[in-house]
Structure formats: structure tokens, C-alpha cells
């Protein structure tokens, strides 16, 4: 069931906490055959808008491998957040990883005592290849011998064709009719674990000019019909607030059907990102900077905001059940539950799956999303105990049904 869009201001923008080793820039935006981007190094785009480097999410360093260790991912970063992950399902287990490109155009991460991790495939095109990080946030593989005219070369592969959980200006989501491949944005399992989660943002396959969010293959949210250029509600609102031209583009030809967007400001620089979070919400963040001022806005879309009585409540829409109307909600609480705990069977895709399982069980009143795709639940008769003094700075968040607090 497609649900109408709801736009509400956010006071908090998601923060991706992680540990990053001491970083040494390579003083370049390009990686060539024979060069390596080692664990402690980074590429910097020409205008210093984006960097490419390894990092360890906090959750993996805290829970998965023990204190002082962690899983390493190759990521493109904006000023504050990762916007693309090259190896979301196959991290490096230590700091031995290094990124390189071979003469056939294959990006790969080599590591100690394990086979290489392929970031891009072999393109079977020997030539003058290189990989460059652009100021758009796109990481492109080019063959200079095929560009002609002394230009930078034809693009053979680009990270924009393989988005993770963020849509940047110029990225295209839709359908490649030639390769029969769909390009979409997929949520992470958690804010610190980049493996694919429960939600996916893409273009409506029916041909309508609208965006859909799916939850495990079922339509969860719809943007409603959008228009090209800047005449859509969201585009007009952002333009009015910050004097920014915000435009949507729907395009269809024999090769590809896609949606993309762009932003620009008359004076100064502007950046934007659409973030699909672990709850299936889209947070649209736009910021600008000039010689005299800086500012920004953040808007989120979600199907359940109108039901929530608390700004901190978890927003995941569920279908009504025999015991729940669909307007109840779980709220995060710092502390722990007493008695009647049990664990779910099998692995989950993060907090959304834990939420759904607890929702469908009429005796479940609280849950917790654990590392490694596990869920813990508490049944009726359990008691919540507030507590805020966890050792080592660990904060235990339990999601408690509003009627049970």
C-alpha cells in the first residue's frame, strides 16, 4: 500500500560515528595502476569537497571484534559523513587493506592472509586507466586512451551507478534498459553497519514519475507524483527558504529510465544529500556557504509522523493487528528491562525487523536491536529500569511500547 508523503523539519541530522585512523592525504584525487591507497591514506577531490578513505564504524569496533579492533570499509566522505561504501558486505578485518586499480580497470582491496575484495569488476580493456574522485562525490574509472581529443577519457565505471544509502546530486536511480539492472538506494542495517538493510528507495517501475520506498519488497512509502524542474512541493519550499534552485529530473529513452536532482545557488556553494535511514525515512539535507553566511535545512519523509506523540519515538509504520491499531509506537529508553527476555530466531536486517517482529507479537512490549543481526525481546510482565551509568560509555537503548513506560 503506497502512503502519501509527509514532510517535517528535523532538529537532528544523522551522525555516523566511527573511528578513523590518523589520515595521511596522497595530495591527489587520482589512483593509477601501480599505486596503492593504504589504510591510513586518503584521496582528496580537486575542490576538497570529498575524500576517499578507510574507516571503522563504532559498532564494529565496540561489539564485533573486541576493544581496539574493528572492521574496515573503503568509503567516500563528505565533510562529516560517509556517502558511499565500496565493500559493504565484505569488510577488511584489520588495517592491512589497501585499494588499488589494475590495468584492466578493476578496483580491488588487497589484505593480509585473505583473497582480494573486488570493488569494481575487470573491464577487460587494457589501456591507460585511472580512478579519480570528483567534486560531485563520484569515483570514476576512466580510460584516457578512449576519450579522444586529449580529454580525461571515457568513463568505464562509476560509483554513482552503485549507490549505497545516500543519493547525491547527479546520481541516477532507475532502470538501465540495456543491462536490465535497477539502480536504487538501500538503507544500512544500522547507522554503524553498512550491510544492506530492510529498505530500498527507487523509481516507480510502472513508469509513473514518483519515488517509492520498499520494505523487504513491499511498497512502504510513495512520494506522490513529482514533476520535472523546480515545480514540486519540496523543490519550491527549499528554493523559497534559502534562495537555492532545487530541480528534479525524470528522463526516459531507449537506454535508461531514471530520476535525478540538482541544486545550485546564485552566490556561494551548496551541497545536498538524500539519506535513506534504517527506519525507511528519507532525510533531505541542503546546506550552503558563502563569504557572509552559512545555513541549511533538513526535511524527512515518513508515513507515521502524524501518529507520534514524542519527537524521540521510533517511526516505522506497521499494519494493524488484532491487538494493535497501528498508531502505537515504541520509544527509545536509556536503561534495561527486567525479566521475560527472549531472542529472535535467525538473522534480521536491523531495527526494522526487530520492530516488526515485536509489533506482530501481542505479548511483546519492548525490543533491542543487537549486533550481528540479532534481536532481543521482552514480554508482558517485564519492568523497565532507567539507568544511565553504563561502563565504558556504552549506552543501552531499549525500545519500549508507549503504553508500557
Each model region followed by its residue ranges:
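Beta-rich ligand-binding surfaces for carbohydrates and other polyanions
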Residues: 2-405
Amino acid at each position: 500500500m503506497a502512503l502519501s508523503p509527509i514532510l517535517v523539519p528535523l532538529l537532528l541530522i544523522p551522525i555516523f560515528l566511527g573511528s578513523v585512523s590518523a589520515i595521511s592525504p596522497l595530495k591527489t584525487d587520482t589512483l593509477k595502476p601501480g599505486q596503492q591507497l593504504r589504510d591510513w591514506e586518503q584521496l582528496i577531490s580537486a575542490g576538497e569537497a570529498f575524500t576517499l578513505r578507510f574507516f571503522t564504524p563504532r559498532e564494529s569496533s565496540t561489539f564485533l571484534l573486541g576493544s581496539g579492533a574493528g572492521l574496515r570499509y573503503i568509503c567516500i566522505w563528505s565533510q562529516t559523513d560517509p556517502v558511499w561504501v565500496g565493500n559493504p558486505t565484505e569488510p577488511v578485518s584489520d588495517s592491512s587493506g589497501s585499494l588499488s586499480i589494475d590495468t584492466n580497470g578493476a578496483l580491488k582491496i588487497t589484505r593480509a592472509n585473505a583473497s582480494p575484495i573486488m570493488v569494481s569488476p575487470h573491464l577487460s580493456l587494457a589501456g591507460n586507466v585511472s580512478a579519480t574522485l570528483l567534486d560531485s562525490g563520484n569515483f570514476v574509472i576512466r580510460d584516457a586512451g578512449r576519450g579522444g581529443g586529449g580529454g580525461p577519457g571515457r568513463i568505464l565505471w562509476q560509483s554513482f551507478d552503485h549507490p549505497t544509502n545516500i543519493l547525491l546530486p547527479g546520481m541516477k536511480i532507475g532502470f538501465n534498459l540495456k543491462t536490465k539492472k535497477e539502480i536504487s538506494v538501500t538503507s544500512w542495517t544500522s547507522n554503524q553497519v553498512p550491510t544492506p538493510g530492510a529498505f530500498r528507495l527507487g523509481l516507480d517501475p510502472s513508469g509513473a514519475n514518483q519515488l517509492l520506498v520498499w520494505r523487504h519488497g513491499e511498497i512502504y512509502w510513495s512520494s506522490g507524483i513529482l514533476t520535472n524542474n523546480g515545480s514540486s512541493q519540496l523543490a519550491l519550499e527549499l528554493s523559497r527558504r534559502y534562495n537555492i534552485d532545487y530541480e528534479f529530473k525524470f528522463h526516459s529513452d531507449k537506454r535508461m529510465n531514471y530520476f535525478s536532482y540538482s541544486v545550485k545557488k546564485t552566490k556561494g556553494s551548496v551541497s545536498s544529500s538524500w539519506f535513506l535511514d534504517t527506519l525507511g525515512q528519507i532525510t533531505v539535507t541542503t546546506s550552503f556557504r558563502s563569504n557572509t553566511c552559512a545555513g541549511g535545512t533538513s526535511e524527512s519523509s515518513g508515513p507515521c509522523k502524524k501518529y507520534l506523540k514524542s519527537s524521540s519515538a521510533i517511526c516505522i509504520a506497521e499494519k494493524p493487528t488484532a491487538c494493535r491499531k497501528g498508531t502505537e509506537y515504541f520509544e527509545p529508553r536509556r536503561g534495561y528491562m527486567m525479566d521475560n527476555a527472549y531472542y529472535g530466531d535467525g538473522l534480521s536486517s536491523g531495527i526494522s525487523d526487530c520492530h516488526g517482529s515485536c509489533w506482530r507479537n501481542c505479548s511483546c512490549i519492548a525490543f533491542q536491536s543487537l549486533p550481528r543481526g540479532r534481536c532481543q525481546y521482552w514480554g508482558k510482565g517485564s519492568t523497565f529500569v532507567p539507568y544511565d551509568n553504563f561502563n565504558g560509555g556504552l549506552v543501552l537503548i531499549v525500545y519500549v511500547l508507549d503504553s508500557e513506560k
